[in-house]
Amino acid sequence: VERELLDAVPNITMKYDTDITPDDFGIECVKTALKTAKPSFANHKMFKKELGENYVIASCYNGLLLGGGSYTLCRLILGNIAKRAKDKKDFFENQLPYVMERMALYMDERIRFEVEESGFFESNFLAKEGFIHRDRFTAMFGMVGMAECVNILMELEGKKGRFGHDKEADDLGVEIMEAINAFNNAHVNPYCEATGGHFLLHAQVGIAQDKNITPGTRIPIGEEPKELIDQLRHCSRFHKYFPSGTGDIF
């Protein structure tokens, strides 16, 4: 039906699992996606492992707990952080830690206000009627612009390799994600108990005002590898860092 109607809405995501989803149905979904850019495909096994059976998809690929939600989504614009750095060392030791700390504190305060002062969870009809539960909420620690960040840092180090096409550049991207992941794992928020007291890392797609900022950890449009398998291999290096979702377009 969607293939014939070509509707722009609603947004549809299929929880895809090789052990559950019939191949013929999966193929029909691919054919529909090629016509309408939906459904999106969610890795059901991975989401289930990270969030449990009772997870849902919000928007196109945001994994959150059923009956919960995200207090807030803030994002690191990594390319802009790299522009502040004198070199790779300065980026890792000073610029990135500073911005992550500021963003985490900002998120903490937003969450504290929502829970302790706003009265939302006491007065909103969704909470009063049992559709949402405060103790199932978390928050999304987002990022965009990995490609620009890596390319800027490579240039600062006098190297020509580019994100998505050079092993050293891609390794640098992984190193950046390891630093972000370590910071998030060390930061505790008392109202994110549903996710172990931590925010969920999220590869954000972007907003309308973004210019020259590549979504999440994607390779910039027009610079994709010639072979699809190479792009898939590249994606696989970053997928594991984002329990609340990451996505790509092929």
Question: Residue spans of the language-model regions?
Answer:
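Conserved catalytic cores of very large enzyme subunits
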Residues: 1-135, 156, 162-166, 170, ...
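Hydrophobic, structured segments
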Residues: 148, 161-162
